[in-house]
UniProtKB/Swiss-Prot annotation:
Gene name of the record: rpsT
Keywords assigned by UniProt, alphabetized: Ribonucleoprotein, Ribosomal protein, RNA-binding, rRNA-binding
A GO CC term assigned to this protein in UniProt: cytosol
Cited function: Binds directly to 16S ribosomal RNA.
Family classification: Belongs to the bacterial ribosomal protein bS20 family.
InterPro entries: Ribosomal_bS20 (IPR002583), Ribosomal_bS20_sf (IPR036510)
Name of the protein in its database record: Small ribosomal subunit protein bS20
Domain of life where this protein originates: Bacteria
PANTHER family from the UniProt entry: 30S RIBOSOMAL PROTEIN S20, SMALL RIBOSOMAL SUBUNIT PROTEIN BS20C
Classification of source organism: Bacteria, Pseudomonadati, Pseudomonadota, Alphaproteobacteria, Hyphomicrobiales
Organism: Beijerinckia indica subsp. indica (strain ATCC 9039 / DSM 1715 / NCIMB 8712)
NCBIfam families membership: S20
Protein backbone atom coordinates (compact mmCIF):
# COMPACT_ATOMS: atom_id res chain seq x y z
CA UNK A 1 0.00 0.00 0.00
CA UNK A 2 1.20 3.49 -0.85
CA UNK A 3 2.34 5.43 2.22
CA UNK A 4 3.55 8.82 1.01
CA UNK A 5 1.22 11.42 -0.50
CA UNK A 6 3.10 11.30 -3.81
CA UNK A 7 2.77 7.51 -3.96
CA UNK A 8 -0.96 7.79 -3.24
CA UNK A 9 -1.33 10.35 -6.03
CA UNK A 10 0.64 8.08 -8.38
CA UNK A 11 -1.79 5.24 -7.62
CA UNK A 12 -4.74 7.52 -8.44
CA UNK A 13 -3.13 8.60 -11.71
CA UNK A 14 -2.34 5.02 -12.69
CA UNK A 15 -5.95 3.97 -12.05
CA UNK A 16 -7.22 6.79 -14.28
CA UNK A 17 -4.75 5.98 -17.07
CA UNK A 18 -5.54 2.26 -16.84
CA UNK A 19 -9.26 2.95 -17.27
CA UNK A 20 -8.60 5.17 -20.31
CA UNK A 21 -6.22 2.63 -21.86
CA UNK A 22 -8.71 -0.20 -21.29
CA UNK A 23 -11.42 1.81 -22.99
CA UNK A 24 -9.22 2.66 -25.99
CA UNK A 25 -8.03 -0.95 -26.35
CA UNK A 26 -11.61 -2.21 -26.19
CA UNK A 27 -12.74 0.34 -28.78
CA UNK A 28 -9.87 -0.65 -31.08
CA UNK A 29 -10.77 -4.34 -30.81
CA UNK A 30 -14.44 -3.57 -31.51
CA UNK A 31 -13.59 -1.70 -34.71
CA UNK A 32 -11.25 -4.50 -35.83
CA UNK A 33 -14.01 -7.02 -35.14
CA UNK A 34 -16.42 -5.00 -37.32
CA UNK A 35 -13.96 -5.17 -40.21
CA UNK A 36 -13.48 -8.92 -39.73
CA UNK A 37 -17.25 -9.51 -39.62
CA UNK A 38 -17.70 -7.54 -42.85
CA UNK A 39 -14.92 -9.59 -44.46
CA UNK A 40 -16.52 -12.83 -43.27
CA UNK A 41 -19.89 -11.80 -44.72
CA UNK A 42 -18.20 -11.00 -48.04
CA UNK A 43 -19.48 -7.42 -48.16
CA UNK A 44 -16.65 -5.47 -49.81
CA UNK A 45 -18.28 -2.04 -49.39
CA UNK A 46 -18.97 -2.55 -45.68
CA UNK A 47 -15.48 -3.97 -45.15
CA UNK A 48 -13.89 -0.96 -46.86
CA UNK A 49 -15.85 1.57 -44.83
CA UNK A 50 -15.21 -0.36 -41.61
CA UNK A 51 -11.48 -0.45 -42.39
CA UNK A 52 -11.45 3.30 -43.09
CA UNK A 53 -12.87 3.95 -39.63
CA UNK A 54 -10.74 1.29 -37.88
CA UNK A 55 -7.30 2.14 -39.31
CA UNK A 56 -6.99 5.62 -37.73
CA UNK A 57 -8.17 4.25 -34.38
CA UNK A 58 -5.57 1.49 -34.42
CA UNK A 59 -2.79 3.92 -35.35
CA UNK A 60 -3.95 6.37 -32.67
CA UNK A 61 -3.76 3.56 -30.12
CA UNK A 62 -0.15 3.05 -31.20
CA UNK A 63 0.59 6.76 -30.75
CA UNK A 64 -0.91 6.66 -27.26
CA UNK A 65 1.25 3.66 -26.33
CA UNK A 66 -1.61 1.19 -25.98
CA UNK A 67 -0.16 -1.11 -28.63
CA UNK A 68 3.29 -1.05 -30.22
CA UNK A 69 3.47 0.82 -33.52
CA UNK A 70 4.65 -2.29 -35.37
CA UNK A 71 1.69 -4.23 -33.99
CA UNK A 72 -0.69 -1.52 -35.15
CA UNK A 73 0.91 -1.40 -38.59
CA UNK A 74 0.73 -5.18 -38.88
CA UNK A 75 -2.96 -5.23 -37.92
CA UNK A 76 -3.89 -2.49 -40.41
CA UNK A 77 -1.77 -4.07 -43.14
CA UNK A 78 -3.29 -7.52 -42.74
CA UNK A 79 -6.83 -6.17 -42.57
CA UNK A 80 -6.36 -4.02 -45.67
CA UNK A 81 -4.85 -6.99 -47.51
CA UNK A 82 -7.93 -9.07 -46.69
CA UNK A 83 -10.30 -6.25 -47.69
CA UNK A 84 -8.50 -5.78 -51.03
CA UNK A 85 -8.84 -9.51 -51.70
CA UNK A 86 -12.64 -9.12 -51.50
CA UNK A 87 -12.81 -6.49 -54.23
Amino acid sequence: MANTPSAKKAVRKIERRTAINKSRRSQMRTYIRKVEEAIASGDAAAATSALQSAAPLVMRAAQKGIVHKNTASRKVSRLSKRVKALA
